[in-house]
């Protein structure tokens, strides 16, 4: 197909998103309100807050531009179909979920393609509420540190055992519980792109 535009928005959030002017693909990719929380060298990541059932929730909107030629050529050289950052991230999040690895929740995403070439996209993810793994580790006792490293190793071992060669750094983990029995109870994996 010459020109293709994909858009997915969770039904439960459509009304709240439309109330701040986010209805169509273009609205998401040109959204400029909210604080920029990404480094200049990374794709734009902005925060936005919505009131859902009387509670204020924070979301991160990751916007991507046109895919660089060298990335597409590298994919073709490796006999892969060129894939945008948005499509890659949605695919990885789905893969993690399919293997019962707790991961951040995307609530909206979209991509625009011309002759199969990514011309931009976005992904909107819900904030994971908890404490950053690195901060928890720093303030933990020696016994807790050992346990945290053990379950971090358990997470990495699970990923590798299932053939998932994705980098998960300690900075990419949020501790959502103080139950350090297993990574599934304690950690949620996020994609950290902010400075």
Predicted regions and their residues:
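Juxta-kinase regulatory segment immediately upstream of eukaryotic protein kinase catalytic domains
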Residues: 1-36
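Conserved ATP-binding subdomain of kinase catalytic cores across diverse folds
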Residues: 23-132, 161
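Short helix/strand-bridging catalytic loops that position acidic/His residues to coordinate divalent metals
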Residues: 76-81, 113, 138-143, 193-195
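Short, surface-exposed, charged/polar-biased interaction segments
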Residues: 82, 114-117, 146, 173, ...
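Short alpha-helical interface elements
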Residues: 85-86, 118-121, 150, 177, ...
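Conserved kinase catalytic-core helix
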Residues: 87, 92-95, 99-102, 136-172, ...
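Catalytic activation segment of kinase domains across protein kinase-like and atypical kinase folds
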Residues: 167-195
